[in-house]
């Protein structure tokens, strides 16, 4: 290798190294500015949403966002509650009583994350073989209590932490 080739290689190396160090430096300066725009982790962990349920008729449901995920709120009819409670636990892939999925004394209200437990798709309401929810992505069927009845989903739809603030308001989170 001639002396001139060594200079060219050394020059190329210094050029590349300088740009690399510069890019890392710019990234180190810009990252804190971008990161400070994210919500505070403590606030995000404690986030709550209050929902007015006074206008929801029996048999109807609404969807709200909480922590970036859909939450299904359904005001079930007496027939839907009876149907959910008549299911034998042996018939369920993930056995759970309907009574354990609702608040005592507020059996008509079902509150659950609107995310299929298989791969995270959003199920369609009032669809499927069990008059509950149907996941169009891979065919999971949930009943009127959000319990998996058929399909690849391994578990029932999740019930988030929630409470009734009063007769017209639910606080999720």
Stretches found by the model and what they are:
Residues 5, 40-44, 121:
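Short, positively charged
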Residues 63-78:
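Early exported N-terminus immediately downstream of N-terminal targeting peptides
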